Amino acid sequence: MQFKFLSTVALATLAVAAPAPTDPTPIPPSQCNTGPIQCCNTVTQASNPVAGLLLGLLGIVLQDLNVLVGLTCSPISIIGLPGNSCNAQPVCCQNNNFNGLIAIGCTPININL
């Protein structure tokens, strides 16, 4: 059990080196109405081998492999407060977060708007 978890985490960290997909135009935080804004270490397409592996390990089947997924994400409650900054990619996801390991249906957020 621990080996499976450690393998999953190790593969998720390798995803940082994976090429990023063509990013859609970021939206302002006020347009995120599907759940809390997430801060993800990596945002990639579901067709990415690492994302596909994580989805498979979690038993998640997606119809559209071009959908953006966030890997190793954590929620940002209120932007601008100390401790709520995001040094990676802030995204708005479709409230499909699996324990922070992967979030599905993500759109980049421009927190500077």
Curated annotation (Swiss-Prot):
How far does the signal peptide extend, from start to end residue? 1-17
**Which terms in the GO cellular component ontology are assigned?**
extracellular region; fungal-type cell wall
Q: What start-end ranges are recorded for coiled-coil regions in this protein?
A: none
Q: What is this protein called?
A: Class I hydrophobin 1
Q: Decide whether keyword Iron is in the record.
A: no
Gene it is expressed from: coH1
What is the annotated localization of this protein?
Answer: Secreted; Secreted, Cell wall
Which keywords annotate this record?
Cell wall, Disulfide bond, Secreted, Signal
Which PROSITE patterns has this protein been placed in?
Answer: HYDROPHOBIN (PS00956)
What does the record give as the function of this protein? Aerial growth, conidiation, and dispersal of filamentous fungi in the environment rely upon a capability of their secreting small amphipathic proteins called hydrophobins (HPBs) with low sequence identity. Class I can self-assemble into an outermost layer of rodlet bundles on aerial cell surfaces, conferring cellular hydrophobicity that supports fungal growth, development and dispersal; whereas Class II form highly ordered films at water-air interfaces through intermolecular interactions but contribute nothing to the rodlet structure.
- Family stated for the protein in its record: Belongs to the fungal hydrophobin family.
- The primary location reported for this protein is secreted
User: Which domain of life, per UniProt?
Assistant: Eukaryota
Which GO molecular function, any one, fits this protein according to its record?
Answer: structural constituent of cell wall
- What's the subunit arrangement here? Self-assembles to form functional amyloid fibrils called rodlets. Self-assembly into fibrillar rodlets occurs spontaneously at hydrophobic:hydrophilic interfaces and the rodlets further associate laterally to form amphipathic monolayers.
Which Cys-Cys disulphide bridges does the record give?
Answer: 32-92, 39-86, 40-73, 93-106
